[in-house]
Amino acid sequence: MFKSSLRLRRVLLIGLALLLPAMGAHAEDPPLVRATNAVRVLNDIMQAPDKAIPTDLLRDARAIAVIPDMIKAGFIFGGRRGEGLISVKTPDGTWSNPSFITMTGGSVGFQAGVSSTDVILVFRTQRGVDSIVNGKFTLGADASAAAGPVGRTASAATDGQLKAEIYSYSRTRGLFAGVALDGSALRIDYDANAAIYGPGITPRRIFEGGVSNVPAPVVDFRDRLEEYTQR
Protein backbone atom coordinates (compact mmCIF):
# COMPACT_ATOMS: atom_id res chain seq x y z
CA MET A 1 0.00 0.00 0.00
CA PHE A 2 2.79 2.39 0.94
CA LYS A 3 4.68 1.53 -2.25
CA SER A 4 1.58 2.15 -4.36
CA SER A 5 1.03 5.51 -2.72
CA LEU A 6 4.66 6.44 -3.25
CA ARG A 7 4.47 5.39 -6.88
CA LEU A 8 1.33 7.48 -7.46
CA ARG A 9 2.93 10.48 -5.81
CA ARG A 10 5.97 10.10 -8.04
CA VAL A 11 3.76 9.96 -11.15
CA LEU A 12 1.89 13.09 -10.09
CA LEU A 13 5.11 14.95 -9.41
CA ILE A 14 6.45 14.01 -12.84
CA GLY A 15 3.21 15.20 -14.40
CA LEU A 16 3.37 18.48 -12.53
CA ALA A 17 6.97 18.99 -13.61
CA LEU A 18 5.93 18.49 -17.23
CA LEU A 19 2.82 20.62 -16.97
CA LEU A 20 4.10 23.80 -15.34
CA PRO A 21 6.81 24.71 -17.90
CA ALA A 22 4.36 24.20 -20.75
CA MET A 23 1.79 26.46 -19.11
CA GLY A 24 4.34 29.09 -18.18
CA ALA A 25 6.13 29.23 -21.52
CA HIS A 26 3.28 31.17 -23.09
CA ALA A 27 1.93 32.87 -19.99
CA GLU A 28 3.11 36.42 -20.58
CA ASP A 29 2.86 37.54 -24.20
CA PRO A 30 3.35 41.33 -24.41
CA PRO A 31 -0.02 43.02 -25.08
CA LEU A 32 0.88 44.29 -28.56
CA VAL A 33 2.11 40.83 -29.58
CA ARG A 34 -1.15 39.43 -28.29
CA ALA A 35 -3.13 41.93 -30.37
CA THR A 36 -1.15 41.09 -33.51
CA ASN A 37 -1.68 37.37 -32.97
CA ALA A 38 -5.41 37.88 -32.41
CA VAL A 39 -5.69 39.70 -35.74
CA ARG A 40 -3.82 36.84 -37.41
CA VAL A 41 -6.24 34.27 -35.99
CA LEU A 42 -9.26 36.30 -37.03
CA ASN A 43 -7.92 36.72 -40.56
CA ASP A 44 -7.00 33.04 -40.92
CA ILE A 45 -10.44 31.83 -39.87
CA MET A 46 -12.43 34.38 -41.87
CA GLN A 47 -10.50 34.04 -45.14
CA ALA A 48 -12.00 30.61 -45.90
CA PRO A 49 -15.67 31.46 -46.64
CA ASP A 50 -16.99 27.89 -46.34
CA LYS A 51 -15.30 27.43 -42.96
CA ALA A 52 -15.57 30.96 -41.60
CA ILE A 53 -17.83 32.32 -38.89
CA PRO A 54 -21.07 33.31 -40.65
CA THR A 55 -21.19 37.06 -41.19
CA ASP A 56 -24.80 37.26 -39.98
CA LEU A 57 -23.61 35.92 -36.63
CA LEU A 58 -20.94 38.60 -36.48
CA ARG A 59 -23.47 41.29 -37.33
CA ASP A 60 -25.77 40.15 -34.51
CA ALA A 61 -23.02 39.45 -31.96
CA ARG A 62 -22.89 41.41 -28.71
CA ALA A 63 -19.16 40.75 -28.22
CA ILE A 64 -16.31 38.78 -29.78
CA ALA A 65 -13.27 37.41 -27.96
CA VAL A 66 -10.16 36.01 -29.63
CA ILE A 67 -7.61 33.97 -27.64
CA PRO A 68 -4.65 33.02 -29.87
CA ASP A 69 -2.39 30.10 -29.03
CA MET A 70 -4.16 28.98 -25.88
CA ILE A 71 -1.97 26.31 -24.31
CA LYS A 72 -3.47 23.09 -22.98
CA ALA A 73 -1.14 20.72 -21.17
CA GLY A 74 -1.94 17.52 -19.33
CA PHE A 75 -0.55 14.56 -17.47
CA ILE A 76 -3.34 13.02 -15.32
CA PHE A 77 -4.28 16.58 -14.33
CA GLY A 78 -4.67 19.11 -17.12
CA GLY A 79 -4.84 22.84 -17.45
CA ARG A 80 -5.32 25.49 -20.07
CA ARG A 81 -4.27 29.10 -20.23
CA GLY A 82 -4.56 31.73 -22.90
CA GLU A 83 -4.48 35.47 -23.37
CA GLY A 84 -6.52 37.47 -25.81
CA LEU A 85 -8.79 40.42 -26.52
CA ILE A 86 -12.51 41.10 -26.41
CA SER A 87 -14.50 43.84 -28.16
CA VAL A 88 -18.18 44.63 -27.63
CA LYS A 89 -20.82 46.03 -29.95
CA THR A 90 -21.51 49.68 -29.16
CA PRO A 91 -24.99 51.26 -29.25
CA ASP A 92 -24.33 52.69 -32.73
CA GLY A 93 -23.50 49.21 -34.08
CA THR A 94 -19.73 49.61 -34.35
CA TRP A 95 -17.08 47.65 -32.47
CA SER A 96 -15.38 49.02 -29.38
CA ASN A 97 -11.70 49.18 -28.63
CA PRO A 98 -10.77 45.82 -27.11
CA SER A 99 -10.05 44.95 -23.51
CA PHE A 100 -7.34 42.43 -22.79
CA ILE A 101 -8.43 39.17 -21.16
CA THR A 102 -7.12 35.83 -19.93
CA MET A 103 -8.73 32.39 -20.15
CA THR A 104 -7.92 29.62 -17.67
CA GLY A 105 -9.36 26.21 -16.87
CA GLY A 106 -8.52 22.73 -15.63
CA SER A 107 -9.49 19.10 -16.07
CA VAL A 108 -8.95 15.71 -14.43
CA GLY A 109 -8.65 12.36 -16.20
CA PHE A 110 -6.23 10.47 -18.38
CA GLN A 111 -4.48 12.89 -20.69
CA ALA A 112 -0.93 13.47 -21.83
CA GLY A 113 0.67 16.05 -24.02
CA VAL A 114 0.56 19.69 -24.97
CA SER A 115 -1.53 21.44 -27.61
CA SER A 116 -1.97 24.98 -28.85
CA THR A 117 -5.47 26.13 -29.72
CA ASP A 118 -6.79 29.33 -31.26
CA VAL A 119 -10.18 30.21 -29.78
CA ILE A 120 -12.87 32.65 -30.90
CA LEU A 121 -15.97 33.26 -28.78
CA VAL A 122 -19.06 34.92 -30.25
CA PHE A 123 -21.37 36.32 -27.55
CA ARG A 124 -24.99 36.30 -28.65
CA THR A 125 -26.59 37.88 -25.55
CA GLN A 126 -25.89 40.81 -23.26
CA ARG A 127 -25.70 38.63 -20.13
CA GLY A 128 -22.23 37.31 -20.86
CA VAL A 129 -21.01 40.77 -21.84
CA ASP A 130 -22.18 42.22 -18.53
CA SER A 131 -20.35 39.49 -16.62
CA ILE A 132 -17.01 40.06 -18.33
CA VAL A 133 -17.34 43.84 -17.90
CA ASN A 134 -17.59 43.17 -14.16
CA GLY A 135 -14.27 41.31 -14.26
CA LYS A 136 -14.94 37.57 -14.60
CA PHE A 137 -17.03 35.19 -16.69
CA THR A 138 -17.25 31.37 -16.60
CA LEU A 139 -18.33 29.45 -19.69
CA GLY A 140 -21.19 27.06 -19.02
CA ALA A 141 -22.04 28.71 -15.70
CA ASP A 142 -22.65 32.36 -16.52
CA ALA A 143 -23.89 31.50 -20.02
CA SER A 144 -24.32 28.37 -22.13
CA ALA A 145 -21.76 27.69 -24.86
CA ALA A 146 -21.72 25.46 -27.93
CA ALA A 147 -19.54 24.92 -30.97
CA GLY A 148 -20.71 27.46 -33.52
CA PRO A 149 -21.91 26.87 -37.07
CA VAL A 150 -19.57 27.67 -39.95
CA GLY A 151 -20.12 28.71 -43.54
CA ARG A 152 -21.71 31.59 -45.35
CA THR A 153 -24.80 31.85 -43.12
CA ALA A 154 -25.96 30.54 -39.74
CA SER A 155 -28.97 28.77 -41.25
CA ALA A 156 -27.37 25.34 -40.71
CA ALA A 157 -27.24 25.76 -36.92
CA THR A 158 -28.72 22.88 -34.93
CA ASP A 159 -31.36 23.30 -32.21
CA GLY A 160 -28.66 22.91 -29.55
CA GLN A 161 -26.55 25.59 -31.18
CA LEU A 162 -29.49 27.97 -31.48
CA LYS A 163 -30.08 27.76 -27.71
CA ALA A 164 -26.48 28.61 -26.83
CA GLU A 165 -25.65 32.11 -25.64
CA ILE A 166 -22.05 31.84 -26.84
CA TYR A 167 -20.66 30.20 -29.95
CA SER A 168 -17.12 28.88 -29.68
CA TYR A 169 -14.73 28.27 -32.55
CA SER A 170 -11.36 26.58 -32.18
CA ARG A 171 -8.45 25.51 -34.31
CA THR A 172 -6.25 22.97 -32.55
CA ARG A 173 -2.76 21.71 -33.27
CA GLY A 174 -0.84 19.14 -31.25
CA LEU A 175 -1.86 16.00 -29.40
CA PHE A 176 -5.41 16.94 -28.43
CA ALA A 177 -8.10 16.55 -31.06
CA GLY A 178 -10.34 19.30 -29.72
CA VAL A 179 -10.99 21.70 -26.87
CA ALA A 180 -13.68 21.62 -24.16
CA LEU A 181 -14.38 25.12 -22.89
CA ASP A 182 -17.10 24.63 -20.26
CA GLY A 183 -15.74 25.70 -16.90
CA SER A 184 -13.10 27.95 -18.42
CA ALA A 185 -12.92 31.37 -16.79
CA LEU A 186 -12.50 34.61 -18.71
CA ARG A 187 -11.02 37.46 -16.70
CA ILE A 188 -10.12 41.02 -17.48
CA ASP A 189 -6.34 41.42 -17.72
CA TYR A 190 -6.00 44.68 -15.83
CA ASP A 191 -2.20 44.74 -16.11
CA ALA A 192 -2.30 44.50 -19.91
CA ASN A 193 -5.04 47.13 -20.09
CA ALA A 194 -2.94 49.45 -17.94
CA ALA A 195 0.09 48.91 -20.18
CA ILE A 196 -1.89 49.90 -23.29
CA TYR A 197 -4.49 52.39 -22.08
CA GLY A 198 -2.95 53.74 -18.87
CA PRO A 199 -3.45 52.95 -15.17
CA GLY A 200 -6.93 52.93 -13.69
CA ILE A 201 -8.75 52.48 -17.00
CA THR A 202 -11.80 50.24 -16.52
CA PRO A 203 -13.17 47.82 -19.14
CA ARG A 204 -16.37 49.85 -19.28
CA ARG A 205 -14.42 53.00 -20.11
CA ILE A 206 -12.56 51.14 -22.86
CA PHE A 207 -15.78 49.79 -24.35
CA GLU A 208 -17.50 53.18 -24.18
CA GLY A 209 -14.71 54.92 -26.12
CA GLY A 210 -13.09 56.76 -23.23
CA VAL A 211 -9.50 56.08 -24.30
CA SER A 212 -7.12 57.78 -26.73
CA ASN A 213 -3.77 57.20 -28.43
CA VAL A 214 -4.58 53.53 -28.95
CA PRO A 215 -1.63 51.61 -30.52
CA ALA A 216 -2.03 50.52 -34.14
CA PRO A 217 -2.09 46.71 -33.50
CA VAL A 218 -4.98 47.19 -31.05
CA VAL A 219 -6.89 49.44 -33.44
CA ASP A 220 -6.29 46.85 -36.17
CA PHE A 221 -8.18 44.25 -34.13
CA ARG A 222 -11.22 46.52 -33.93
CA ASP A 223 -10.96 47.40 -37.63
CA ARG A 224 -10.83 43.75 -38.69
CA LEU A 225 -14.04 43.10 -36.76
CA GLU A 226 -15.66 46.01 -38.59
CA GLU A 227 -14.47 44.65 -41.93
CA TYR A 228 -15.76 41.12 -41.37
CA THR A 229 -19.06 42.36 -39.96
CA GLN A 230 -19.81 44.45 -43.05
CA ARG A 231 -19.18 41.75 -45.64
Description of each model-found segment:
Residues 11-21:
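Bacterial N-terminal signal peptides
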Residues 23-27:
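Sec/Tat signal peptide C-region and signal peptidase I cleavage site
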Residues 2-13:
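Bacterial N-terminal signal peptides that target proteins for export
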Residues 28-231:
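Small-residue-enriched, tightly packed secondary-structure blocks
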